[in-house]
């Protein structure tokens, strides 16, 4: 159980048999009446967002999520197959469960799979990944670090804005949280 006073962004709770993640919260102390906590909750499974108000100090069941490090091995139709590299046990997730994470997911990548009651819910990517540029406009002589950007398509199909001097075939580091270019990767 967790008190509504202890809610923070990212806290997971159980309501009506589902797992919800707190995405916004506000402690309100009106002039009259008792204090309350106004929250915006996102369903981990369906992605729907609702607003809910809790009394200050109200106890709510906390959802205890398990994270396990798995490797994305292959696609099977519409399902992504992950393998635990110690037990060789397979876990399957649908494209809907993976959501926006799929644009950075490539075979052989290790990710955290979040489970609740031994049922996989979602994938947590690392904060940054290294991917190869598959398609972008060619660089022109004189395109240095002047601050300009151009769109580039990565090997996974994701599109990010990169500096003008980046060309096809180069490996770059991308921030998976905000789809931004972090730098060239030299190997």
Curated annotation (Swiss-Prot):
Q: What is this protein called?
A: Elongation factor P
SUPFAM superfamilies (alphabetical): Nucleic acid-binding proteins, Translation proteins SH3-like domain
Q: Which UniProt keywords apply?
A: Cytoplasm, Elongation factor, Protein biosynthesis
Location of this chain's protein in the cell: Cytoplasm
Q: Which GO terms describe its biological process?
A: peptide biosynthetic process
Q: Does the keyword DNA-binding apply?
A: no
Q: Name one GO molecular function term.
A: translation elongation factor activity
Describe the task this protein carries out: Involved in peptide bond synthesis. Stimulates efficient translation and peptide-bond synthesis on native or reconstituted 70S ribosomes in vitro. Probably functions indirectly by altering the affinity of the ribosome for aminoacyl-tRNA, thus increasing their reactivity as acceptors for peptidyl transferase.
Q: Which gene encodes it?
A: efp
Protein's organism: Prochlorococcus marinus (strain NATL1A)
Q: Pathway, according to UniProt? A: Protein biosynthesis; polypeptide chain elongation
Q: Please tell me where this protein is predominantly located.
A: cytoplasm
Regions annotated as coiled coil: none
GO CC term (a single one): cytoplasm
Q: Give the family from UniProt.
A: Belongs to the elongation factor P family.
Q: Which InterPro entries match?
A: Elong-fact-P_C (IPR015365), NA-bd_OB-fold (IPR012340), Rib_uL2_dom2 (IPR014722), Transl_elong_fac_P/YeiP (IPR020599), Transl_elong_KOW-like (IPR013185), Transl_elong_P/YeiP_cen (IPR001059), Transl_elong_P/YeiP_CS (IPR013852), Transl_elongation_fac_P (IPR011768)
Does the entry feature the keyword Cytoplasm, yes or no? yes
């Amino acid at each position: 159980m967790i008190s509504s006073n202890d809610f923070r962004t990212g806290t997971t709770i159980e309501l009506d048999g589902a797992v919800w993640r707190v995405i916004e919260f506000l402690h309100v102390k009106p002039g009259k009446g008792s204090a309350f906590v106004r929250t915006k909750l996102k369903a981990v499974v369906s992605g729907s967002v609702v607003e809910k108000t809790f009394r200050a100090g109200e106890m709510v069941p906390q959802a205890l999520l398990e994270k396990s490090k798995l490797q994305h091995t292959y696609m099977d139709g519409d399902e992504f197959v992950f393998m635990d590299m110690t037990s060789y046990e397979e876990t399957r997730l649908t494209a809907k469960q993976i959501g926006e994470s799929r644009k950075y997911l490539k075979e052989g990548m290790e990710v955290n799979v979040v489970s609740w009651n031994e049922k996989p819910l979602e994938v947590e990517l690392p904060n940054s990944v290294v991917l190869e540029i598959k398609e972008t406009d060619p660089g022109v002589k004189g395109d240095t670090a002047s601050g300009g950007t151009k769109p580039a398509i990565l090997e996974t199909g994701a599109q990010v804005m990169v500096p003008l001097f980046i060309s096809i075939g180069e490996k770059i580091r991308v921030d998976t949280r905000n789809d931004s270019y972090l730098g060239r990767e030299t190997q």
